[in-house]
Amino acid sequence: MAQMRIKDIAAEAGVSPATVSRYLNNRPGQMTEETRARIAAVIERTGYRPRAAARNLRSSRTNLIGVILADIANPFSSAMLEGLSSSAAARGCSLMTAISGNDPAKEAESLARLIDAGVDGLVVNTCGGNDEAIVAAAGRLPVVLLDRDVADGGIDLVTSNNRELVAGLVDALAAAGSERLCLLTEASDDSPVRRERAEAFAEELSRRGLAGEVVTLADGGATGVGRLDEAIRGYAGKKLGLIAVNGLVFLRLTEALAQLGPSLPAGLKIATFDDYPWNHVLFGGVTTAAQDTLAIAERVVERLSERIDVVTTTVGEAAKLAPKRIEVPGRIEHRPSTSR
């Protein structure tokens, strides 16, 4: 009799090969008892045994980590991918990476594809709109969220201390004499990080009695320039301070300011999130809330490894590892853009 394979077991049990794989991995998720019983009966009747080189039982691993990133065009994402790769390699693991392009449908497809590929765990930098799918995935295998949370998911999250960093940037602009502040953000509000920073910004303005608003820069073209010009003209005669909510928005801000040119008010101060080489050059050096991307990546892989260890060594213990929100401290790099 020919060697039985997973697809043969699946055909006889009337299920997909992925379902058989989850059964063999002790990751049943929402699999019914009836489905489990059918698979078990076929395995017992055929005497199926996975080949040693290919089996994915609890006692062994694929050493593959699935990574889903929302926007590779964001410099934060490319820096994070490098850090995740290094941290995973140090533990003998490789990455399988998917880019959703801020498309919830692509993100959902990536979740399913990576799970079916047999990764040991998932790192998800969600674009939003897939909370239920991500929570369901976390019921099937270890998941750690990168930078962006989901609602009521009870899933580990590793992020920066965003509220403290916002306060630090407001401090820098206030000390530089700014009388009105604008937080520049993107059109979409799907990012929990951008929402958290906007909320923290509003709280800081209220606490300090400062005037300001959140301004949307839709893109680096005419729309973004026009909106910024409106904000600047609305604060005529006031010393204005601008904060870019992330590195991508900062690049859009830089383009918009270049187009506005001579109409810029005297004493304009600028600060941003995300520290990249151009921050040291543009505007004579830009005061920056620098996230520790390497430390964030290390903590993500470390936490995911802890969950994988539990799943692969102790039956039923995964749920006992309580979810954590891990905030990795960033720092404020003070530069000439906020000097008096």
Predicted region positions:
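Short beta-strand elements in bilobed, periplasmic/extracellular small-molecule ligand-binding domains
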Residues: 88-99, 180-184, 198, 202-223
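N-terminal helix-turn-helix DNA-binding module of bacterial transcription factors
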Residues: 1-62
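Flexible loop/hinge segments that line or gate small-molecule binding clefts
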Residues: 124-168, 188, 248, 274-286
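Hydrophobic alpha-helical segments within soluble ligand-binding/sensing domains
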Residues: 156-183, 222-230, 291-312
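Amphipathic helical "hinge" segments at domain boundaries
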Residues: 33-37, 46-113, 117-120, 199
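Flexible loop/turn connectors
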Residues: 233-340
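An alpha-beta-alpha
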Residues: 169-208, 316-337
